[in-house]
Swiss-Prot record:
Protein name: Penaeidin-3n
InterPro entries: Penaeidin (IPR009226)
Pfam families tied to this protein: Penaeidin
Modified residues (Pyrrolidone carboxylic acid): Q20
Any single biological process term in GO: killing of cells of another organism
Keywords: Amidation, Antibiotic, Antimicrobial, Chitin-binding, Disulfide bond, Fungicide, Pyrrolidone carboxylic acid, Signal
Provenance organism: Penaeus setiferus
Subcellular location: Cytoplasmic granule
Annotated signal peptide: 1-19
Modified sites of kind Serine amide: S74
GO molecular function, one term: chitin binding
C-alpha cells in the first residue's frame, strides 16, 4: 500500500513539475527580460597597441572609436 501511495505521489509530482498536472502560475518557467550586456569602455584602449586590424574594426563598430593612431586604421 505504501508503495502505491509513493508511486502516485511521485507521478503527480512529475506532472506538476512538467506543468501538465497543475496550470497555476508557479509551474511555468520564469521568463527573464533580455538584458543587454554592459560593454566596458576599457575593452578597447585608446592607443590600441597590440591588437589586430580586425579587433580595431570591432572596437570602432561597437564603441564608436577608431584606433587609427597606432594601427593605421582609419575606420
Amino acid at each position: 500500500m505504501r508503495l502505491v501511495v509513493c508511486l502516485v505521489f511521485l507521478a503527480s509530482f512529475a506532472l506538476v513539475c512538467q506543468g501538465q498536472g497543475y496550470k497555476g502560475p508557479y509551474t511555468r518557467p520564469i521568463l527573464r527580460p533580455y538584458v543587454r550586456p554592459v560593454v566596458s569602455y576599457n575593452a578597447c584602449t585608446l592607443s590600441c597597441r597590440g591588437i589586430t586590424t580586425t579587433q580595431a574594426r570591432s572596437c570602432s563598430t561597437r564603441l564608436g572609436r577608431c584606433c587609427h593612431v597606432a594601427k593605421g586604421y582609419s575606420g
